[in-house]
A protein has these predicted regions:
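Helix-capping/transition residues at the boundaries of transmembrane alpha-helices
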Residues: 45, 49, 76, 125-127, ...
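Hydrophobic alpha-helical transmembrane segments of multi-pass membrane proteins
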Residues: 32-35, 109-112, 172, 176
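Residue-level signature of the transmembrane alpha-helical core
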Residues: 27-31, 47, 58, 62-66, ...
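Transmembrane alpha-helical segments of integral membrane proteins
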Residues: 147-160
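Transmembrane helix boundary and interhelical junction motifs in multipass membrane proteins
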Residues: 30-59, 115-122, 146-149
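Pore-lining and gate-forming transmembrane alpha-helices of multi-pass membrane transport proteins
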Residues: 138-143, 166, 170-178
């Protein structure tokens, strides 16, 4: 943890020296990771909270993750369609059925509670008829709650000064929130779906 804090201090110094360039570099890195479906988005989100704080971290991650997801979506639709079809085609029927039944709300539920991995959703949605703009704004809205939870956890990690800090009520609360979020989201969606069915 001490090594992490030492590295964090150096990174923060670089950020403070050239804040706009640093944020732009982080943003492009996040977009690239997401667009190429490389694992690490969750860690990058925590780091964003540690480096930029809650508000800026949320803004950076929200747009970077959505733009990256949309690039993956477009790549699947126009470049990698055959490969995605052969790799994940067995899951496509569930996506098509969900969109046929609930439209864009189905994508919203997948973003809120991912039944499929994040990158698989991006790729498979590219094979559907959903419009690019709809994919973009629904994805951004659906991922926002999770982004807030993860960035908030990152802000707490940045404040840990020693191993004892790992047991601080605030940090523990942040990770409890991370664990409870999918269950809370599932309950909320159940209520929404029940009202929609009335």
């Amino acid at each position: 943890l001490e090594n992490f804090k030492a590295q964090q201090a150096e990174i923060l110094a670089a950020k403070n020296a050239h804040p706009l360039i640093f944020i732009a570099g982080f943003f492009l890195t996040y977009v690239t990771i997401t667009g190429l479906s490389i694992p690490g988005a969750a860690i990058m989100t925590l780091i964003a909270g540690a480096l930029f704080g809650l508000v800026i971290g949320i803004v950076v991650v929200s747009f970077a993750s959505t733009i990256g997801a949309t690039l993956a979506f477009l790549g699947s639709r126009y470049v990698l369609r055959d490969w995605v079809q052969s790799k994940f085609g067995e899951r496509l029927k569930a996506i098509d059925d969900g969109l046929a039944k609930d439209g864009a709300f189905y994508l919203f539920t997948l973003r809120l509670i991912p039944v499929f991995p994040f990158f698989v959703i991006n790729l498979l949605m590219g094979l559907t008829r959903i419009r690019t703009w709809t994919f973009f704004w629904v994805s951004q809205l659906g991922m926002l709650a999770g982004t807030i939870v993860y960035v908030n956890a990152g802000t707490q990690i940045s404040q840990v000064e020693s191993t004892a800090g790992l047991l601080s009520p605030t940090l523990i609360g942040s990770f409890v929130l991370l664990a409870l979020f999918p269950w809370a989201a599932r309950g909320l969606l159940a209520v929404v779906n029940s009202r929609r069915g009335q």
